[in-house]
Structure formats: structure tokens, C-alpha cells
């Protein structure tokens, strides 16, 4: 299917907390809870990305309006050490099905953040995998079409992330997440392997900033796919800014004992995932 026309309809964020015109007049929230409402405690966002898609394929020519992204998000800072974040897609099914974390895939993020010290913090709950790459870190409403590797990855899973701020410009993360959303069969098909007892993915991440000229977002991950079957994923995101000139270069490599992304499996007719696959991608 070839898409040759796309029009960005709307991409924006709407803040859900506004000050009263009269500072002496209490809001409904204050009347009910007795608490003074502050913008850092609750913020609401609406993220939208739409297009008009014109297609020319074997079925003929056609066109339609398409709402690519429609997400609502609430996040806030409860106090100086506790925060929360929730983001959900309105154009994805809310059925939780057989999801191992008991949450529907429409929920991208749902968890709490805790500041453990001046340098250490953690986030527990459903969250985005801390993979490297500049493209991977962009807001989805800013993306028209992801590269094939990112488009076919599972990016939102449940677990915990620990962050260490070595300096104001360098942060290191260690993250442990479920490696599945649904069941093993839903993810890989009928593959003749023994399931692992700990379907987890472990990620080390480094976010660096060198005088706002060169920035890094690098990661290394290992995923338990099945017993004695693993996936190794390396992502090196690099961003360069020189005055009015800017560019980024992402390098991604994935070695999978079971074809997790299923790109090669789909090219060969679908069905159960191939017993092994390797992918490499460069995006700039």
C-alpha cells in the first residue's frame, strides 16, 4: 500500500489545570477536598495526530481521514519525592484479554515515581522500555511513520526502573520489565519450545549530554524469550547540534533466538515465529 499524501490535522497538548481569574475564589476541587490546587500536582494532556491517507494498491485508489494518535495523559508531582503518571490511547481496545500484567494494551503508562535521594530515583508500574535511540524517545505525535524495527517492537510493559543521576548531564538507568504483554502463543505463535519461568527484559541505559552539542541515548538489553532462548538488543542514539545545524544517527541491532519482531516471519508467510532472526537498522 502506497501512501502519497498526508496532512497533519492536529498535534498539541492541552494543560488541564488553569488558575482562577479571582485568586480569592475557591475552585470546586478546593471546596470538595479542602486542599489548595497547584498546577504541579495535576496536569492533563491531550495528544492528537491525524492525517488524510490516499492509497493506490491492488484494490484500487482510495482515501480516508485517519486518527493515528489519540492519547490522554495525567501526571503530577504530589510532593518533593512522590510523582505519578498515566497515559492511555483512546483509539485502541481496552480489552485486557490474557495480558500477564492485568492491564489492557491501550494503557501505555501507569505508575508512580519515587525520589530516593538527590541522585537516585525509581518508577514502578507500566512504562516505556528504556531503549536507546533518538527516534525511540520522540513523542509519538511527532512521528508520521516509525522505522520498521521500532514499529514492530513491544515498547510498553510493566516493571520497575532505577535511575542514577551521576551529574546534571549524565543519567544511568537499570530497568526490569515483563517481556510479554499477552501470552507466549499470542506473541510468538505455536513455537515448539519450553516457556521460561521468568519472562523478563533487563535494560541498561545511558543518557548523556556534552555541552548541548552532542547527546547520547544508548542502551543494551537482554530478554528472556523462552527456556534457553534470549533476545539481545543494542540501541545507540546520537544527536549532534552545531548552531543552526542538527542531526541524529540511531544504530540498532537485535539478535533473537525466536523472531520477536516477526518481520522476517511475515515476509515468509507468517505463522509461528522463525527459530532465529537478526535485524540491524540505521536511522538518520
Language-model features, listed with the residues they occupy:
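Cleavable N-terminal export/targeting peptides
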Residues: 1-29
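Beta-barrel outer-membrane channel/assembly domains of diderm bacteria
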Residues: 19-122, 162-172, 239-241
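Surface-exposed coil loops of outer-membrane beta-barrel proteins
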Residues: 49-58, 95-103, 120-207, 218
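Transmembrane beta-strands of outer-membrane beta-barrel pores
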Residues: 50-56, 69-71, 80, 88-94, ...
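Residues that define the transmembrane beta-barrel architecture of outer-membrane proteins
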Residues: 61-68, 103-108, 154-158, 196-202, ...
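Short C-terminal domain-edge/linker segments immediately following a structured domain
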Residues: 75-80, 152-159, 247-254, 269
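Detector for outer-membrane/organellar transmembrane beta-barrel domains
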Residues: 199, 204-284
Amino acid at each position: 500500500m502506497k501512501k502519497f499524501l498526508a496532512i497533519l490535522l492536529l498535534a498539541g497538548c492541552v494543560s488541564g489545570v488553569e488558575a482562577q481569574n479571582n485568586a480569592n475564589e475557591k475552585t470546586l476541587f478546593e471546596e470538595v477536598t479542602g486542599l489548595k490546587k497547584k498546577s504541579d500536582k495535576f496536569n492533563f494532556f491531550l495528544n492528537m495526530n491525524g492525517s488524510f491517507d490516499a492509497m493506490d494498491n491492488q484494490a484500487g485508489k482510495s482515501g480516508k481521514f485517519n486518527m493515528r494518535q489519540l492519547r490522554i495523559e495525567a501526571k503530577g508531582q504530589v510532593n518533593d519525592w512522590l510523582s505519578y503518571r498515566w497515559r492511555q490511547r483512546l483509539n485502541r481496545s481496552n480489552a485486557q484479554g490474557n495480558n500477564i500484567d492485568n492491564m489492557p494494551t491501550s494503557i501505555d503508562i501507569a505508575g508512580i515515581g519515587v525520589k530516593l535521594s538527590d541522585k537516585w530515583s525509581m518508577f514502578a508500574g507500566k512504562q516505556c522500555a528504556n531503549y536507546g535511540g533518538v527516534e525511540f524517545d520522540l513523542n509519538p505525535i511527532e512521528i508520521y511513520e516509525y522505522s520498521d524495527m521500532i514499529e514492530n517492537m513491544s515498547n510498553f510493559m510493566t516493571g520497575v526502573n532505577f535511575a542514577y543521576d551521576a551529574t546534571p548531564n549524565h543519567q544511568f538507568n537499570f530497568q526490569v520489565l515483563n517481556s510479554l504483554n499477552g501470552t507466549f502463543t499470542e506473541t510468538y505463535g505455536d513455537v515448539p519450545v519450553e516457556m521460561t519461568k521468568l519472562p523478563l527484559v533487563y535494560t541498561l541505559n545511558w543518557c548523556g549530554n556534552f555541552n548541548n552539542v552532542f547527546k547520547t541515548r544508548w542502551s543494551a538489553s537482554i530478554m528472556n524469550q523462552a527456556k534457553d532462548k534470549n533476545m539481545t538488543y543494542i540501541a545507540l542514539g546520537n544527536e549532534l547540534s552545531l548552531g543552526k545545524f542538527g542531526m541524529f544517527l540511531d544504530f540498532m541491532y537485535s539478535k533473537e533466538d525466536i523472531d520477536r519482531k516477526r518481520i522476517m516471519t511475515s515476509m515468509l508467510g507468517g505463522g509461528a515465529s522463525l527459530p532465529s532472526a537478526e535485524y540491524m537498522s540505521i536511522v538518520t
